[in-house]
């Protein structure tokens, strides 16, 4: 796990904290199922990932597909945002996240969906 958020992650985190007043609570860099998630809202089973240039390689893209499939089987939805989208239009990113949350009912947490010790990948 990184000690500090990247600038785009920090910018998104500030925006996500604004969603708390509407009852949406995100955790940052959460260790779950052997992975560190950039942000996760467990109640709504929503994962947010901030992707930089390293995610454009085929190897990393395959890793991301596998990871997303692992969480999809657990009932989680993953939204990925490019650094540039957060930098250039944070408002649109937050609006999209809010729209997804508002149209997704909260899901019950089961034992299998609770966090487990993470690992860096």
Where are these regions (language model features)?
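Nucleic-acid endo/exonuclease domains
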Residues: 1-110, 116-121
């Amino acid at each position: 796990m990184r000690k500090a958020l990247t600038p785009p992650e920090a910018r998104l985190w500030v925006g996500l904290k604004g969603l708390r007043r509407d009852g949406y609570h995100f955790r940052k860099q959460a260790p779950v199922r052997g992975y560190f998630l950039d942000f996760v809202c467990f109640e709504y089973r929503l994962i947010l990932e901030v992707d930089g240039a390293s995610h454009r390689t085929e190897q990393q893209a395959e890793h991301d597909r596998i990871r997303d499939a692992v969480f999809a089987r657990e009932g989680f939805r993953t939204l990925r945002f490019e650094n540039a989208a957060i930098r250039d239009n944070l408002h649109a990113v937050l609006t999209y996240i809010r729209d997804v949350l508002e149209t997704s009912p909260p899901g019950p947490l089961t034992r299998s969906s609770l966090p487990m010790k993470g690992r860096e990948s």
